[in-house]
Each structure stands twice: as C-alpha cells, then as structure tokens.
C-alpha cells in the first residue's frame, strides 16, 4: 500500500531537499508527468482540462536527497471563484519553490494561456526546465519547442533554461534524466517528509480525487466541471476490507439525476471504476459507497469551497 503519511521528519542537515512546481496551461500532462516522476499515482488524470484543482504534492526520496513535486492546476482565465482559487494555487506554488518545470503541448503553437504561464515563470530566479510533451502526436515538434522557448527570451544569461522533449520512445529515460537534473539543483536542507512518504495528501483526499477522476471520464459536456467529491468515512475491517463512504457534489438537482443516470447506471459505473483503481493501489478489497448531493452554486460560494477543501 502506498504510504500517504506526511508528518515532518527533520533529518541530518547535510541532506538536500526542495520543492519543484510543475506548471502549464490546462491539459498538457502535468499530473501524468508527476506520477511518472514518482512511479506511482498520487494525482488524478483525465483527458479533460482542469482535472487538477489544488496543488498536489508528490515526494521522491533518493539517498540523501528529497524532491517535493507540486502539481499545480492549469493556469487559465478564471470564470468563477473556483477558477480564481486554482490560479492562486499556481502563483502560491511559484513563490515558494526551488525549481520550476513548465510543461507544454507540442501539438500546438503557444496560446494566450501559455503566454500567461511564460509571463509567470520568465523572470523567476530559479532553475527552469521546459518540457515539451505529446511529441508523438505533433507534426513539427522541434519548431513548436522553439516557439515556446522564444516566450522566455529576456530571461537573464545567469538563469538558463533546460529543455526536454518527451515521446513514447524516450519517455522513461527522459523522465529519469530530468529527475536526476532536478535532484542536482536541490538546496541543502533537512528532509521535509519521512522516507517512504509518497504524498502529503490524506488518504481520504486521495480517494476523493480518484472518484472525481472517474466521474470526469464518464460525464459529458460542462457537467464534470460542476462536480466535486469528498470522502466522509473510511474504516477497515479485520479481514482487510476497506469501507469507504463518499459523496459526489453537484450544483443543481438536474445535475444530480444526470450523475445517477437511468436506474442508477451512471453512478454504478463511476463507483465501479473508482473501486477498481482503489483496490489496485491499496492492494485490498474495497467497498465504495457513493451518494450524490446538491450544494447550489458551490463553485461561486467561498464557504462551500472551504468546506470542500479548496482553501
């Protein structure tokens, strides 16, 4: 079972440890890259933009060095209070980290959202790593990479940019090489987390994100973006069965019916898919109970956002 404990454990001061922000516009593969860095799944992934809503921290420890990756939401032009919160997570991460990984989608030239990211990272006095993703599906990946690099022109000569292009053929080796480069730029610090910790998330938050990931895969149109999830109860029986009780939160009664589906079919499919993921990572049988509840306009309600963990 993945260890999600994260109580601080200060170690020998000769160790090196630091934080690395993974940034980029929505849906460029930031969470997938985080999971690849760690070799385990701590962040939800889906083909839909804005799957990541809060800064998820993943921890990689090797010998006397510890990397704490911060997977940030996609930087975008917000439409509601939730979107503003997500952008604030990005800017907060950038202010506190020791290095930055900027992930870009080489299938397309830079967009206004990419320029937002470039403007946020260009002048940071921190090591910057530009990662070109989705190379296999790009017609002209090298040309696209040059366009993204050009957005960083004006960065001082004392602030070099390291570039990496990921493809299906080189993904494993390229990720390992990039991780080694990040390990080398860590400042001298005591460890921030105990060895063996994979994330600072509680197990309840991690499970809630798995449920939301599967909901986003199943639901259509704009509905996935009006969905939140939480786990209210988690108990373990003597035989190892994990009993998890969760909620899917929507904004309207009409949305509730869409999530449940005819005869409960949609909700069952979401629950079954989430349960299978949980069983793989927990290495235990899981009973997952899901209820759909309505919190009107929760994305614009700051109190509701806080209750759902967006604070």
From Swiss-Prot:
Gene Ontology MF terms in the entry: GTP binding; GTPase activity; ribosomal small subunit binding; rRNA binding; small ribosomal subunit rRNA binding
UniProt region (G2), positions on chain: 50-54
Region (G5): 166-168
Membrane topology: Peripheral membrane protein
Stored Pfam families: KH_2, MMR_HSR1
KH type-2 domain residues: 219-296
Record's keyword terms, sorted: Cell membrane, Cytoplasm, GTP-binding, Membrane, Nucleotide-binding, Ribosome biogenesis, RNA-binding, rRNA-binding
UniProt keyword Transferase, yes or no: no
Gene3D superfamilies listed in its UniProt record: 3.30.300.20, P-loop containing nucleotide triphosphate hydrolases (3.40.50.300)
Residue intervals of the Era-type G domain: 16-188
Binding site for GTP: 24-31, 71-75, 133-136
Annotated spans, G3: 71-74
Cross-referenced InterPro entries: G_ERA_dom, GTP-bd, GTPase_Era-like, KH_dom-like_a/b, KH_dom_type_2, KH_sf_prok-type, P-loop_NTPase, Small_GTP-bd
Subcellular location: Cytoplasm; Cell membrane
GO cellular component, one term: plasma membrane
PANTHER family hit by this protein: GTPASE ERA, GTPASE ERA, MITOCHONDRIAL
Family classification: Belongs to the TRAFAC class TrmE-Era-EngA-EngB-Septin-like GTPase superfamily. Era GTPase family.
Subunit annotation: Monomer.
Record's protein name: GTPase Era
Organism from which the protein derives: Deinococcus radiodurans (strain ATCC 13939 / DSM 20539 / JCM 16871 / CCUG 27074 / LMG 4051 / NBRC 15346 / NCIMB 9279 / VKM B-1422 / R1)
Upper classification of the organism: Bacteria, Thermotogati, Deinococcota, Deinococci, Deinococcales
């Amino acid at each position: 079972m993945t260890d999600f404990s994260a109580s601080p454990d200060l170690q020998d001061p000769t160790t090196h440890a630091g934080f690395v922000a993974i940034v980029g516009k929505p849906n460029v593969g930031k969470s997938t890259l985080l999971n690849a860095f760690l070799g385990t799944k701590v962040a939800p992934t889906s083909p839909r933009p804005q799957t990541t809503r809060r800064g998820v921290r993943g921890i990689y420890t090797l010998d006397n060095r510890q990397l704490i990756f911060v997977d940030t939401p996609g930087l975008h032009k917000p439409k509601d209070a939730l979107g503003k919160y997500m952008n604030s997570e990005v800017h907060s991460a950038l202010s506190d980290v020791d290095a930055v990984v900027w992930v870009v989608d080489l299938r397309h030239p830079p967009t206004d959202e990419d320029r937002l990211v470039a403007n946020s990272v260009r002048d940071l006095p921190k090591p910057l790593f530009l990662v070109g993703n989705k190379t296999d599906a790009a017609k002209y990946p090298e040309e696209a990479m040059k366009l993204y690099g050009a957005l960083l022109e004006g960065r001082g000569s004392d602030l070099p940019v390291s570039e990496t292009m990921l493809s299906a053929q080189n993904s494993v080796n390229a990720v390992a090489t990039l991780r080694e480069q990040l390990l080398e730029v860590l400042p001298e610090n005591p460890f921030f987390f105990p060895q063996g910790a994979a994330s600072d998330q509680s197990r309840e938050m991690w499970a809630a994100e798995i449920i939301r990931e599967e909901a986003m895969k199943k639901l259509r149109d704009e509905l996935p973006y009006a969905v939140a999830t939480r786990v209210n109860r988690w108990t373990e029986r003597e035989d190892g069965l994990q009993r998890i009780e969760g909620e899917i939160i929507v904004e309207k009664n009409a949305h509730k019916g869409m999530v449940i589906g005819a005869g409960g079919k949609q909700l069952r499919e979401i629950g079954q898919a989430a349960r299978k993921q949980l069983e793989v990572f927990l290495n235990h049988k899981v009973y997952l109970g899901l209820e759909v509840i309505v919190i009107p306009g929760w994305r614009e309600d700051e109190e509701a956002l806080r209750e759902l963990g967006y604070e």
